[in-house]
Amino acid sequence: PDLDTLRGRPRMPRDQIYRAGKTGNNMCGIVGYTGGKNAVRVLLDTLSNLEYRGYDSAGISVFGDNGIETVKAKGRLQNLADLLAHEHAKLSGHCGIGHTRWATHGEPSDLNAHPHATEKLSLVHNGIIENYQQLKASLTAQGYTFVSRTDTEVAAKLIDSLYRGDPVAAIIKAQELLEGSYAFGILFADHPGEIFATRQGSPLIAAAGNGEAFIASDVPAILKYTRD
């Protein structure tokens, strides 16, 4: 599907937001997987194929035994792999999203690393939200608090504020408010096994087949798994 949405154009049709799992020069890396394989292993492997893009932190969110579980770490991808091999060795699942971050808003840190999560969702992002300060002020007035200095956390909580049980509707409403370039991969807590993704300006590809689906910022991330 064509995932591109341009601000000022007619509202994006519902079938133009990519839903996986149900029958500028920004160099962050996004991956997502849903299928029969171990999602933790697939996410780490696909993220390793995006290391050439440069990054300062990495993280993943996976549908585990306790809902969406998120692990992230400053520094090299190996730091994340070590956390997953030891402190979070029990994390397992078949659907998740991953991210390597190149800082644009907020210094490199565990808190600023992606994914950014709320009780309702977890989100990874490549791009720059130009009006995030205005959106953050509006969300703060609604009672939201922020733990990072990133525009990504603002995007996550904006979608959270608009969510009424329909992921596609919430994403469309958020896109009407967001200014800038972005690609999102999103898990919704009440939609286990599914990934929702959309983009405006920033690169994002989607592939599906043989009972599994992928999203990625670039082809090399998933080339060994699929060519569809």
Regions found by a protein language model. Give the residues of each.
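Extreme N-terminal basic, low-complexity initiation segments
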Residues: 2-9
